[in-house]
């Protein structure tokens, strides 16, 4: 456990020594701070100079990582050891994008051979849709792709297709359906033509309640309009491992793309779950996405901790969570194409590390994953940045931006990028009472009024942030960015001694929903309901009589 590691008391002592130190003083005294706390991996860079740390902090954090045998645990993941201990599974999402030819054997399966076989089928299918060779039941080309999934079968593909819209096929419109409330699927069905739509049903077991409910609604709608169930074969494909259920649905087994237990849902966009990505972007751009992630994998595996991007981000996060007692972390992308990135990272981070039981089954006496949240940075400045600047919470921020200007939007990117730098500087530097008072007096305010108002215009500063810069929003850079966060999450899971690759927390609610659904559908259940739940069930039934 973290609190039992030999470096932990050293970090506690160091925290007491520097907790009141202000970053603006460090910048003032150290002219090389920005260049020393800056790491670049090809066209992705991290400026971590605006953090409440110094060389001693980093040295101790690296010692902490060594206490946990982080290097050895990184290797264990890449080699296919069953580090997902509660489910007795390997964790090999890295194999999905590996360019290495050294085979990984897992329970007598050749992992890379299996992965590349599925990728080959995905490429052939993608080419047939994009080229117009794959036609619908009336011989129309496919114009709309509807991805039906939830969680990891939805968020990754949605985020990547949105982020890389400039690389998408101009004929294809992408639609993503995850919510079971009925509104989302019906809204999509109103917009599309059954004769030119391809549905991708993404569910490993092909039994996920939300996904199957939406898929069956889409199936019914399609059959009513096409007039024959046999046409399903041309318009529905599955990403699943349950061949029997897929065939019962009406999907040709040749249109089923498999993935494996060694790939968790939130790590699966690189697998057949990314079929919608490949169709939209094409195999060349999908390969670039994989290559960017592989580049980050190799960096994570081989770079020394001092210049290792995921290690640095992971350890800095631990520094705030477990020593400054920070409870929250903000993701602030300054690019409209990255608008879904915060909620993708929400799932990746909180479903992985939102746990309180150690690998040995013991209750952990320290905080683990913070609440991860975020929004488009420029919009957030006019919404919740007030709390970040002058509120009572310490909330570290990841600013994410690109250097590349958007075509046909002269002056826009300069305004956007100036705000990234200004906000990061403001969070670091702040504004003192004396500075605020001087500004007000310079504007001609009465001295007594200025003294009162100046208190409200103070910015304490010392708010930490990272700045992640991409040269441009490209497939390879998005691949590297996602892999960076995947590995950051892994680093923190190792430090906290938790299993980052199960998600038992999603199970209880699903179990309890079964008897409640029986009651709502008019059937009697033998389950016990607390008085509140029972009252709300009756309220629903009475309203819908």
UniProtKB/Swiss-Prot annotation:
GO biological process: gluconeogenesis; glucose 6-phosphate metabolic process; glycolytic process
Recorded catalytic activity of this chain's protein: alpha-D-glucose 6-phosphate = beta-D-fructose 6-phosphate
InterPro entries registered for this protein in UniProt: G6P_Isomerase, G6P_Isomerase_C, Phosphoglucose_isomerase_CS, SIS_dom_sf, SIS_PGI_1, SIS_PGI_2
GO CC aspect terms: cytosol
Subcellular location: Cytoplasm
Keyword Transmembrane tagged: no
Pfam families named among the record's database cross-references: PGI
Keywords: Cytoplasm, Gluconeogenesis, Glycolysis, Isomerase
Biological pathway: Carbohydrate biosynthesis; gluconeogenesis; Carbohydrate degradation; glycolysis; D-glyceraldehyde 3-phosphate and glycerone phosphate from D-glucose: step 2/4
Catalytic site positions: 351 (proton donor), 382, 510
Entry EC no(s): 5.3.1.9
Example GO molecular function: glucose-6-phosphate isomerase activity
Enzyme class: isomerase
Chief localization: cytoplasm
Family: Belongs to the GPI family.
PANTHER family attached to this UniProt entry: GLUCOSE-6-PHOSPHATE ISOMERASE
Its job: Catalyzes the reversible isomerization of glucose-6-phosphate to fructose-6-phosphate.
NCBIfam families xrefs: PRK00179.1 (NF001211)
Protein name as annotated: Glucose-6-phosphate isomerase
Organism: Helicobacter pylori (strain P12)
Gene for this chain: pgi
């Amino acid at each position: 456990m973290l609190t039992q590691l030999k470096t932990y008391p050293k970090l506690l002592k160091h925290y007491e020594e520097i907790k009141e130190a202000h970053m603006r003083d460090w910048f003032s005294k150290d002219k090389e701070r920005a260049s020393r706390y800056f790491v670049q991996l090809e066209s992705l860079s991290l400026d971590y100079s605006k953090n409440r740390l110094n060389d001693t902090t980093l040295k101790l954090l690296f010692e902490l990582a060594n206490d946990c045998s982080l290097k050895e645990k990184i290797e264990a993941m890449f080699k296919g050891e069953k580090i997902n201990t509660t489910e007795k599974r390997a964790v090999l999402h890295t194999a999905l994008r590996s360019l290495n030819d050294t085979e990984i054997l897992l329970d007598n399966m050749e992992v890379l051979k299996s992965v590349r076989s599925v990728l080959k089928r995905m490429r052939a299918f993608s080419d047939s849709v994009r080229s117009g060779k794959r036609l619908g039941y009336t011989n129309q080309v496919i114009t709309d792709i509807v991805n039906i999934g939830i969680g990891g079968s939805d968020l990754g593909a949605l985020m990547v297709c949105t982020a890389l819209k400039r690389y998408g096929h101009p004929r294809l419109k992408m639609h993503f359906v995850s919510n079971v409330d009925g509104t989302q699927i019906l809204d999509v069905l109103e917009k599309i033509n059954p004769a030119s739509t391809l549905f991708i049903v993404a569910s490993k077991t092909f039994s996920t309640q939300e996904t199957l409910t939406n898929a069956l609604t889409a199936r019914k709608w399609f059959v009513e309009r096409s007039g024959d169930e046999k046409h399903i074969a041309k318009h529905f494909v599955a990403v699943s491992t349950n061949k029997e259920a897929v065939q019962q649905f009406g999907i040709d087994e040749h249109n089923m793309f498999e993935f494996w237990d060694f790939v968790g849902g939130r790590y699966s966009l690189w697998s057949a779950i990314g079929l919608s990505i490949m169709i939209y972007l094409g195999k060349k751009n999908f390969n670039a996405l994989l290559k960017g992630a592989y580049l980050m994998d190799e960096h994570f595996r081989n770079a020394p901790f001092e210049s290792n991007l995921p290690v640095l981000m992971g350890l800095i996060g631990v520094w705030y969570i477990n020593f400054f007692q920070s409870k929250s972390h903000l993701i602030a992308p300054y690019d409209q194409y990255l608008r879904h990135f915060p909620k993708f990272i929400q799932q990746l981070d909180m479903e992985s590390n939102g746990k309180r039981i150690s690998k040995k089954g013991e209750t952990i006496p320290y905080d683990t994953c913070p609440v991860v949240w975020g929004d488009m940075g420029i919009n957030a400045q006019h919404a919740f940045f007030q709390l970040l600047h002058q509120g009572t919470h310490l909330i570290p921020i990841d600013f994410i931006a690109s250097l590349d200007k958007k075509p046909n939007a002269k002056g826009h990117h300069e305004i956007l990028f100036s705000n990234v730098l200004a906000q990061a500087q403001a969070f670091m530097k702040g504004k003192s009472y004396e500075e605020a008072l001087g500004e007000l007096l310079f504007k001609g305010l009465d001295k007594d009024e200025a003294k009162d108002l100046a208190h409200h215009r103070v910015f304490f500063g010392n708010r930490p942030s990272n700045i992640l810069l991409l040269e441009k929003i490209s497939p390879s850079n998005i691949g590297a960015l996602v892999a960076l966060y995947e590995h950051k999450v892994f680093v923190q899971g190792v430090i906290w001694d938790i299993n980052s690759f199960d998600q038992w927390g999603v199970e209880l609610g699903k179990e309890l929903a079964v008897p409640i659904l029986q009651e709502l559908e008019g059937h009697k259940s033998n389950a016990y309901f607390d008085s509140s739940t029972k009252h709300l069930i009756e309220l629903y039934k009475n309203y819908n009589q």
